[in-house]
């Protein structure tokens, strides 16, 4: 008889954007996109969902470790190029992407075993969601943390806005999210954002030692302790995550994400002055070319943005 909950070997899974291994009661999920600083695409999320579900159901797994490939980045958040190519054009796809992201985060947080974030490089933007979602975190001493959302037209509302104040305090959370300045691994340690900082060459040894200690917990007691410890995170998450998903979807068609993401891709500063100047002058700063209120008297086309001087349908100069 087929046993639906039987243990599956890690080699059974054919992942492309993550590495998945199970060894000595520890399951390790590695974001394997170092060429884009381990940014997370929709494909990455699908694979993470499958890996976390397997780790949750595998009774031989006692600890789950999440890390990134290489030594440059743990995770840089969502894939900016995918955002520009997919979500700016079709916001409904961003809603779908966020659904995958929320599912993956939920599975990781409720995997039923202690979780460890092995921070091997920069933790940027929504990458900090995954650090905050883990029970414990060990960082290499070269790691830097930075929240860039408000400068690239996004809000990191998939965990960071909800959980960062609970972990480091409200003032420090506001400092990270609104100032957008880097903080070092040592500063993160002093703030309680990580549990330990070690030289990069000692990172695996430290993570393995922590995992060996966590294995000694009785599994049901550890699972329920995690459930109780997650109360405030669960409460904040339940009250805001769905709202954030919808608002970020609607906002993805606005000028701010267009300018912010494009500036990030072009590796240039965000032109926040133009957005502020148009608003100060009484124009629409929410839309790239202004509100779609103009009409062409020549062909009758409607819904033309205020910033257009010519009709996009017939080419006539607008009155």
Model-based region annotation:
Residues 5, 12, 68-104, 123, ...:
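Glycine- (often His-adjacent) and acidic-residue-rich active-site loop
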Residues 24-32, 46-88, 107-117, 140-144:
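A structural preference for short, pocket-lining loop segments at secondary-structure junctions
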Residues 34, 138-143, 194-242, 255, ...:
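C-terminal long alpha-helix characteristic of the crotonase
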Residues 74, 305-310:
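Short Cys/His-rich "knuckle" micro-motifs
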Residues 106-219:
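Crotonase-fold acyl-CoA enzyme core
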Residues 296-299, 311-314:
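Short cysteine-rich clusters marking metal-coordination/redox-active sites
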Residues 302, 317:
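Cys/His-rich metal-chelating microdomains
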């Amino acid at each position: 008889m087929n046993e639906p909950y039987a243990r599956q070997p890690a080699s059974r899974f054919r992942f492309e954007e993550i590495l998945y291994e199970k060894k000595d009661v520890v399951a390790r999920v590695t974001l394997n996109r170092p060429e884009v600083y381990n940014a997370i695409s929709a494909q990455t999320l699908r694979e993470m969902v499958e890996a976390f579900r397997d780790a949750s159901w595998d009774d031989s797994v006692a600890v789950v470790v999440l890390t990134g490939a290489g030594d440059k980045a743990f995770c840089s958040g969502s894939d900016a190029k995918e955002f520009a190519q997919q979500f700016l054009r079709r916001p409904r796809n961003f809603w779908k992407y966020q659904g995958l992201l929320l599912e993956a985060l939920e599975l990781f947080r409720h995997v039923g075993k202690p979780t460890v974030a092995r921070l091997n490089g920069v933790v940027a933007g929504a990458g900090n969601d995954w650090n905050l979602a883990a029970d414990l975190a060990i960082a290499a001493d070269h790691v830097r943390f930075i929240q860039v959302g408000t400068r690239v037209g996004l809000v990191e509302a998939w965990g960071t806005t909800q959980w960062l104040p609970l972990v480091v305090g409200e003032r420090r959370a506001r400092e990270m999210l609104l100032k957008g300045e880097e903080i070092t691994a040592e500063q993160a340690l002093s703030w309680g954002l990580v549990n330990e900082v070690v030289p990069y060459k000692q990172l695996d040894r430290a993570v393995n030692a922590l995992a060996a200690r966590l294995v000694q917990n009785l599994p049901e007691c550890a699972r329920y302790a995690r459930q109780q410890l997650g109360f405030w995170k669960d409460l904040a998450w339940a009250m805001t995550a769905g709202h954030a998903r919808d608002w970020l979807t609607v906002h993805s068609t606005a000028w701010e994400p267009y300018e912010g993401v494009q500036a990030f891709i072009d590796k240039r500063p965000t032109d926040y002055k133009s957005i502020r100047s148009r608003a100060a002058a009484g124009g629409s700063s929410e839309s790239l070319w202004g509100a779609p209120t103009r009409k062409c008297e020549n062909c009758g086309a409607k819904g033309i943005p205020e910033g257009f001087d010519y009709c996009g349908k017939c080419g006539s100069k607008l009155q």
